[in-house]
Every structure is written in structure tokens, then in C-alpha cells.
């Protein structure tokens, strides 16, 4: 599956660096999350939001070559709006679940 195919399916690309990177210059697009999130936690949150995530391996993020996968999700309004929905869900998930350690 190519990135062009994703546009035809009305999907956007979410790189893990948007959430995992320590600085904005390295790719983080949102406010810092005060805890480390795992890829599985990110994918499960996307499923809960109904964004139908597809993990695509062997795709490298241009700013950080260590990241070798991307996540394609259904587009909701704009990319920035979709990222904010995901960020708010990640922040709310950790706050409402006290069993997970910070």
C-alpha cells in the first residue's frame, strides 16, 4: 500500500514522532505528554476513537530515521483536528486509569 492509496481512501498518515519526539524540531506536533506511551497504547486508543488504524511497516519518518512505521487513520475534518482528538484521548486515558504508572 502506497501513501497515494491512503489519500484515495480519505486517510491521513500519523507518524509516531508526532507523539514520541522530545522536541518539536524532531517532529513532535502536539504538547508534550507527561508520560511515555507505547505503540500498542496508541493503536488501541485509535481503535477506541473509531479511526480504524492501519500500521504500515518499513516506512521511515524523514526527520528521524529510527522510526520505521506509520499509522494511517480515517480523516476527521483536518489533520490537525484529528491529531488534537488523539492527543486529548491519550491524556484522558492515562488520567482516568490510575492503575498505570506514570
UniProtKB/Swiss-Prot annotation:
One of its GO terms (biological process) is SRP-dependent cotranslational protein targeting to membrane. The keyword Cytoplasm applies. Its main location: cytoplasm. It holds the Pfam family SRP19. One of its GO terms (molecular function) is 7S RNA binding. It is found in: Cytoplasm. Keywords: Cytoplasm, Ribonucleoprotein, RNA-binding, Signal recognition particle. GO terms for cellular component: signal recognition particle. InterPro entries: Signal_recog_particle_SRP19, SRP19-like_sf, SRP19_arc-type. It comes from the Archaea. Involved in targeting and insertion of nascent membrane proteins into the cytoplasmic membrane. Binds directly to 7S RNA and mediates binding of the 54 kDa subunit of the SRP. Belongs to the SRP19 family. Part of the signal recognition particle protein translocation system, which is composed of SRP and FtsY. Archaeal SRP consists of a 7S RNA molecule of 300 nucleotides and two protein subunits: SRP54 and SRP19. This is Signal recognition particle 19 kDa protein. The gene is srp19.
